[in-house]
UniProtKB/Swiss-Prot annotation:
Keyword annotations from UniProtKB, A to Z: Methyltransferase, Restriction system, S-adenosyl-L-methionine, Transferase
Family, as annotated: Belongs to the class I-like SAM-binding methyltransferase superfamily. C5-methyltransferase family.
Activity's thermal dependence: Rapidly loses activity at 37 degrees Celsius in the absence of DNA.
Name assigned to this protein: Type II methyltransferase M2.BsuMI
pH-activity profile: Optimum pH is 8.0.
Activity regulation annotation text: Somewhat inhibited by MgCl(2) and spermidine, strongly inhibited by MnCl(2).
Family annotation (Pfam families): DNA_methylase
Encoding gene (name): ydiP
Source organism of the structure: Bacillus subtilis (strain 168)
Amino acid sequence: MKVVSLFSGIGGIELGLHQSGHTTEIFCEVDPLAKAVLSKNFPGVKIEDDINEIRELPSCDLVAAGFPCQDLSQAGGKEGIDGSRSGLVKKLFELIEKKEHANRPPWILIENVPYMLRLNRGKAMSYLTSVLSELGYTWAYRTVDARCFGLPQRRHRVILLASLFEDPKDVIFSQDHSEPDLDGKPSVVDHSNYYGFYWTEGLRGVGWAREAVPPIKCGSSVGIASPPAVWSPYEDIVGTINIRDAERLQGFPEDWTNITTETGKDIKEGARWRLVGNAVSVRVSKWIGENLSQPKGSISDFEGELVTKTWPSAAWGYGDKKYKVPVSKWVANTEQIAISEFLNHPLKPLSARALNGFLGRAARCTNVNYSDEFINSLERCKDRQLQKV
């Protein structure tokens, strides 16, 4: 398929589609650093600067749009689908509406965060699905955990696929696997495992993950990186992962974002974390691309319970019909790679200040029961860091 990419970021959707036999005809990305990453890794493909400057949607088989999540995420401003950033997806529909029905792109692929299913009672999903139906598309969406492809990062994202002439259920609901209980709780630890967590949190939650890391974030609004930490009980060490391992956790090759800026300087690490944290998992889009090339058929017609008040984790619809779909977040069941075996680069030890901040928050936390072994190990790590000063 020929792909037109909007809100391209660093090309996570497109790399996965390329790996499954599809080609990108044009990118559209406003961020200068993301554009530089695209230029480096997709040489020769045209890059438009701003979706607001596009007057006509080029002819294609599929439009990919991982539109901005800042207004829809739990950590963002929560302005919703009418926010200045997430609301840019409306431009996509304006471009499609300009075309005659028969000339509209046969497929539309949209990606965003699961929180949009709950924010403002799911107003964003209500908007997306209603507009797609008005434009003549049948749609299906599913929340997918990228960890099901074997990479040790827990990452849930909503994948919305719409088709003008075919049935998107044959792509989105062609596989389903039970979700394993992988992560356990911070109150119980095993010496043989590594544990991932958010060292910047600790007061209300920690993102605990056994032999994996919680979702890679894009960092702060001022470009300060906040990579997840990994703790090894056996080695009695705790540190943050390397940006090159973070790229691999997202399905990219190492140094995908290692570019030279327009000023001739090397890109700052905080900027790389932002780019990688905002990216779509390559493994997820590769799965979609493979199923688009060879649809396996939906495991059921799913014409049972209708969507009523709240949006479920998966659904499909056409016209004014919206059906719940009882499937898991695991579309594959690839053998899991432990984070202890996955990392190519050493952990960067957390500073005494960072550890002290986390330990202080953990001490005040009332809804997470941290094991004494975890807390005591972090105290020892802090003491060793202080001795170095």
